[in-house]
Design a protein with these regions (language model features):
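Membrane-embedded segments
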Residues: 52-129
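An N-terminal hydrophobic leader/cap segment in hydrolases
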Residues: 4-50
């Protein structure tokens, strides 16, 4: 019984150490593009957004009428890239909205590594843009 308890504790400790050192990979895992045939049905402008810590983030901007319409700030979410979200952006085509979608640090070719504080900074930089 004592041997079983020792092995259980060792396995548990190993699991905790593993999760601690690999948590970033488990939380922010880039995904493959599963939407190869999707095409944007609206015109977009590729933009670069500078963050306070000096990173440049890739984004796509679509403007219908900046004075008449609200602007949606859209984050592509965990994993994937901007291209993975084309099928979602096409839903904005018939709406009277402008939109800006940005790729987080570490995604879509952007430099940096994703972290909670970095994601906040990316969001604030996009809002200020």
């Amino acid at each position: 019984m004592l041997l079983f308890l020792q092995i259980t504790i060792l396995v548990y400790l190993f699991l905790l150490v593993f999760l601690y050192f690999y948590q970033r990979n488990l939380m922010y895992h880039p995904d493959e593009n599963n939407y190869f045939n999707d095409k944007l049905s609206v015109n977009i402008e590729e933009v670069e957004i500078s963050t306070q810590d000096g990173l440049r983030l890739l984004g796509w901007y679509h403007e219908k009428d900046i004075r008449k319409n609200k602007t949606i700030l859209f984050f592509h979410g965990n994993a994937g890239s901007l291209e993975n979200r084309i099928h979602k952006l096409n839903h904005f085509r018939d709406m009277s909205v402008n939109f800006l979608i940005i790729a987080w640090r570490g995604f879509s070719g952007n430099e940096g590594k994703p972290s909670e504080s970095g994601l906040y900074e990316d969001g604030e930089s996009a809002i200020k843009w």
